[in-house]
Each structure stands twice: as C-alpha cells, then as structure tokens.
Amino acid sequence: QREIETPEPQGYEVLLKTVACGVCHSDVHIHDGYFDLGGGVQLPSPLPGGEPLTMGHEIFGEVVAVGEDVEGIEIGSKYVAYPWMGCGDCDLCNDDMTHYCANNSNLGIHVAGGYGDHVLVPDTKYLFDAGDTPDSLAGSYACRGLTAYSALKKAGPYTKDNSLVIVSAGGLGLLALK
C-alpha cells in the first residue's frame, strides 16, 4: 500500500470521493496479469507498463471538487462514474463511441479507479445519476448492468413465440432476469 496525492480537478474534471466500488471478475484478471481464455490460453491484462494502478471500475461516488469549467454539478451530489473512456481524439471517440476506442483510458483499468479514496473523472459527461439505486449497487450497473443489457439487446427481438435461456445465476445472469 502507498499513499497517493488526492488529485485537484482542472477544466471539466470532477473529483469523486469513492462511496462504493464493485469487484468485477475482470478486476481479478487484471490483478493476476492476464485474462484466462481457457485451454491454457492467456491474454495479457492491460496494465500500463507495470506501473502501480488503483483498480476498480464499478464506481459510485460523491462530488467533492470540480474543475473551473464545470457547470451543473454540485458538491455533495452522488453519481455513477461511467468507466469506459476513449482517447478523445479518434473517429470513434468523436462519434460518441468511446467504449470501442483502441487507445482507451478506462477508469480502474488504464488510469486510477475507485478502489482508492478518490477518483478523478475527466469530464461531467461520464457522470450519471443513479436514481434510487442503493449506493452499494449503483456503480456495478456501469459494467455488469451494461453487459447484461447489451447481451439481451443483441439476442432480441422478443415475441411470445420465441424463448431466451439465461444460463447462470451469477451477477450477470440474475441481472438479466430482472
């Protein structure tokens, strides 16, 4: 463990105090240094050059500071931090498809995430109101929630004449049932 300076937000950045941060199975792979693809095949994890990294991408936090260009975000408000961030310069990022960017800077995977006391979110567009979702679950919806939703959307359309089988009763499978 080491102490890391609390960042000071600039421009459109927002500093969140971590309220809750889920543990995703991807975090286990990143910690281990590889994704186990089965059959002895391993895909190296995306850790940046062996540098220490504060992991955690299922982030829910409270705004404690904002950059000078931020408008409409109040200190004390709580938000889910959308972790899937692109480079901001490529065609995909310019078309608001940052989650497909090959040069991404995902929170908790490529840049400091929510397992620390604070996380610096680069822009207010990555903050989402969690509504009445419990604090302990809110951040996980930016990962497991989107994963389950995306799978269901790709499997559709649904009618009374077709069926869908959800195999598994883990976090993703149970959320898909909701």
Where are these regions (language model features)?
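Short Gly/aromatic-enriched secondary-structure transition segments
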Residues: H29-D36
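Residue-level marker of beta-strand positions
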Residues: E58, S77-K78, L92, H118, ...
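A structural motif shared across PLP-dependent enzymes of the aminotransferase-like
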Residues: D91-L92, H110-P122
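Short cysteine/histidine-rich zinc-coordinating motifs and their immediately flanking basic loops
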Residues: D36, C101-L107
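Glycine-rich beta-strand-centered segment in the early N-terminal region that forms part
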Residues: E5-C21, D36-D91, G131-T133
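Local cysteine-cluster metal-coordination motifs and their immediate loop/turn environment
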Residues: H25, M85-Y100
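Mid-domain Rossmann-like dinucleotide-binding core that forms the NAD(H)/NADP(H) cofactor-binding site
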Residues: D117, D132-K178
